[in-house]
Amino acid sequence: MKHFESKFLTRQLTTDQFTYNQIIGMLIPLILDQLFIYAISLLTTSMISSSGQDSVTAVTLVTPINFMITMIQAAFCSGGAVVIAQYKGHGDTQKVQEAIGQTIWFSICITTVMSLVVFFASRQIIEILYGAAEVGVKAKAKLYLAGMALNLIIHAPRTGTGAGLRGVGDNKHNLYGSLLVNVSFFFFSLIFINWMDMDIEGTLLAYCLARTLGLFSSVYFLFIQKNGNVRIRLKQMLLPKKEYIKSIWRLGVPFSTEEIFFNGGTILVSSYMVLLGTTSVAAHAIANSVFTTLYAPLTAVGILATTVIGQCIGAGRRDLAKKYGKKLVIMGYVVITAFVLIVLPLLESILQLYNPEPETLKVTWKLLIIGMSGMVLFMPASTVMPYTLRAAGDAYYSTGVSLVTMWGIRVGLGYLVSIVWGLGIEGIWACMAVEWILRSILFLIRYCGQAWLKKKNVIEAEAESDEK
């Protein structure tokens, strides 16, 4: 049986660029990394729920804003990861090191600017977006938003370092850093929220301490670890270089634009979701927390696509990029189906961690049934394919598709279905499933063509620039 599995995986995944052992070896740490991130978030949300429904609602309202900042930061780092992966595929070690340093520099700069703006405008942001919310909820939301904005500055070097590790395919050490941050965050949350009853303040303090440990882990990987895959010199991080910043910017701007408008749409959905009542908002918060944990393996496959496709493109092997693009989507279907089947029998116990009220629990179950049905059927293609296109440099198409489907279906149709037609929070989740269907179709059309494979990689773009 073992010989058959090895032979099958060799036939499916092994090429002259990667062996199946390398692919699986990169995937497993990524899945574990994403699972720990989402599982710790799930457990923390359940801890916050012990402080009352106001706290859960406040965190839910702020999460899309916080997530937007985080994803803009991650978007530019993803652009950096593509650059790093392409240089890695080309075999240029010095360029890889310089690209890692520049990615971290960019991450720190962009995060600091965004976080300070949100910190000083936190009161106005909450009033504008969630003025209809209850007074107690708004007070907690303002505190949480301001605190999380400052916390993200501490997290910026760790995000850049993670992009470097993913770009070179060293997901094992990235997992170690992620485990340090997330496990310590869980224990700090346990102390400050459950034992000391510090509510929102406890969550913020836990984030601060855990992300400080993450900062120390980045220093270790970058400057102390001997023979590390991302070891760099300090000047490679402190002195900005035009050619790298230009490449990171070229790939990062479409990513970040997508995140701004995508999460802006999520915030708008949250703002009209408030009109459906606290029960609907709380049910959405719980269902979304569980759902994002289920989503973790797909995110892992998508991140793997950045490394694999990026290195194939950097090596000039566009034929392999096409092959692996298809294989990774299939891998996404296998992984998510297996994971949903494993988690499904445990859902009842997981939901009880949130101490939901009976009516909230009833609505939560409905949302999860809608979400999981669409997830297994449509999410692998709609999630993994954009990573493949971006890793090849085709960032604008994936951004355009994501924005049109998000604003047209989830925001526009979601408002009509939930508010105007009166189908409530269930209507919003049904629209999410429709969005995944449309995304899958549009990305499949692009993948079957050749335009995404004709984009210049960073080596070709650099050579063209030198000629000019």
Language model features with spans:
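Helix-terminus/linker motif at the lipid-water interface of multi-pass membrane proteins
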Residues: 38-57, 126-135, 191-198, 260-293, ...
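Transmembrane helical elements of multi-pass membrane transporters/channels
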Residues: 25-44, 147, 181, 210-214, ...
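Transmembrane alpha-helix boundary and packing residues in multipass membrane permease domains
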Residues: 30, 34, 45-46, 63, ...
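N-terminal transmembrane alpha-helices
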Residues: 14-46, 50-51, 67-79, 111-115, ...
